[in-house]
Regions:
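Context-gated lysine
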Residues: 2, 12-14, 19, 27, ...
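Low-complexity, Pro/Ser/Thr- and charge-rich linker/hinge segments at domain boundaries
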Residues: 77-111
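Short, flexible coil/linker segments at or flanking structured domains
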Residues: 41, 49-51, 100, 107, ...
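Beta-strand-enriched, solvent-exposed domains that form extended recognition/catalytic surfaces
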Residues: 1-88
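Catalytic cores of extracellular degradative/oxidative enzymes
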Residues: 99, 108-250
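Short, motif-level signal for alpha-helix interfacial/capping segments enriched in acidic residues
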Residues: 8-9, 65-67, 93, 195-196, ...
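Short amphipathic alpha-helical surface micro-motifs
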Residues: 43-46, 93-95, 100-103, 151-157
């Protein structure tokens, strides 16, 4: 399919890309078949852009616009002329609004854009399983707060708060179709058949230390910055400090 994208505001000499991620690639199996999404990358320019997306499965579009000093960069305006709007979940929406987005989502997957964590799950899984700590449906805001808290606690245990080095970025989590849990090329990943556990605030907060351990352990790999928290022979050990710390807090 072809999509028209209009862009304004790209600074001269700055590269901005459109990345279309097909989180479902038609594979479900072992040996990491279905373990990672298919990514198509297109360079954007000011004005008219014709995006020729030729992958078999539909994807979600993300604008990649980075700089070492983002506060100095101008905002972009990006208009998908004939794109289909999937929407995304974020704390500024009500739980009902987010439920409706999941129920009507044209894509198999949905983005959750928290304050410290960006995650992607199946739209149906979010609609069915994302309940609050009391078991009530529509626990989206609380769910994003739980994930944000896990990252905030990891940053605290690493001294980022104490030394005023908190990153202004988001950690990532996404659903996969091959394996229970792993740290993938993009972030922490859980198999789609685990969504009943990892999307439920009641389960995460009250009775599933393994899920908290897994999220914290795998995100802990991202925080193993040599030589500060990653030493020889301890690649699967030092990050368990985050797991213990987060389970204790939760």
């Amino acid at each position: 399919s072809k999509m028209a994208v209009m862009v304004t505001g790209i600074p001269e000499g700055k590269q901005v890309q459109l990345k279309i991620m097909a989180w479902w690639t038609g594979k479900e199996g072992n040996n990491f078949d279905g373990g990672n999404p298919n990514q198509k990358t297109y360079t954007l320019q000011n004005g008219f852009n014709l995006i020729d997306y030729d992958y078999t499965y539909e994807g979600l579009a993300y604008v990649s616009y980075y700089d070492a000093h983002p506060e100095t960069m101008p905002e972009l305006t990006v208009h998908f002329v004939n794109g289909i709007v999937n929407g995304y979940l974020s704390p500024d929406k009500t739980n009902q609004e987010m439920y409706d987005l999941c129920a009507k989502a044209p894509n198999l997957h949905m983005d959750c854009w928290g304050n410290k964590v960006h995650s992607v799950w199946t739209s149906n899984g979010l609609k069915k399983y994302c309940k609050d700590v009391n078991g009530n449906p529509k626990g989206y805001r609380q769910f994003m707060n739980v994930l944000d808290s896990l990252i905030a606690w990891e940053h605290r245990s690493l001294g980022f708060e104490k030394y005023d080095r908190l990153p202004n970025t988001r950690s990532f989590a996404y659903v996969n179709y091959t394996y229970y849990m792993f740290q993938g090329g993009y972030g922490v990943s859980f198999h789609h058949n685990q969504e009943q556990r990892v999307l439920s605030c009641k389960t995460l907060i009250t009775n599933d230390d393994d899920a908290i351990w897994g999220l914290s352990h795998e995100w802990g790999h991202q925080h193993q910055m040599q030589p500060y928290f990653c030493w020889g022979g301890l690649g699967e050990v030092s990050n368990n400090v985050q797991s213990y710390y987060n389970i204790t807090h939760m």
